[in-house]
Amino acid sequence: MNIRDMSINAVLAAIYVALTVINPIGTGAIQFRISEILCVIPFFNRKYIPGMVLGVGIANIFSSLGLIDVVVGVTISVIAYTLSYFIKNVWINALQYSVLAGLFVALALYLVLGLPYWFSAVTVGLSTLITTFIGAFIFKKIGHRILPE
């Protein structure tokens, strides 16, 4: 990875962290993380995986769940981006990312806060699906203009 790619990854991580931390409804059973729009970027270009994984890890430090949210978020990202090597369709990748987020985040919310598992799985999964589909649409339309190859 060259310095330019490292710099772009650092900027993506920083933007993800900023969008997550300033969002008052970015954590919990009912959440809407606008920053998840960015999580589809590695589905278009895998060289941005490190930046997104780093961004998720740093952003989740600020979660009320603390370290467990860091582990869960990074795990979701690593699994989803690994699966994306075998799944080439960006929409299916956005879907699998959202399902993983719903299932794993709900488990953390259940174990740490005692929140109902299936309610959390559905609400987190749906909100993530909405934002990742928005991201997929945006980056499919204009990604080539705003993301360097």
Q: What are these model-predicted stretches?
A:
Residues F43-N45, G57-S63:
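Interfacial segments of multi-pass membrane proteins
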Residues M1-F43, K47-P50:
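Hydrophobic transmembrane alpha-helices
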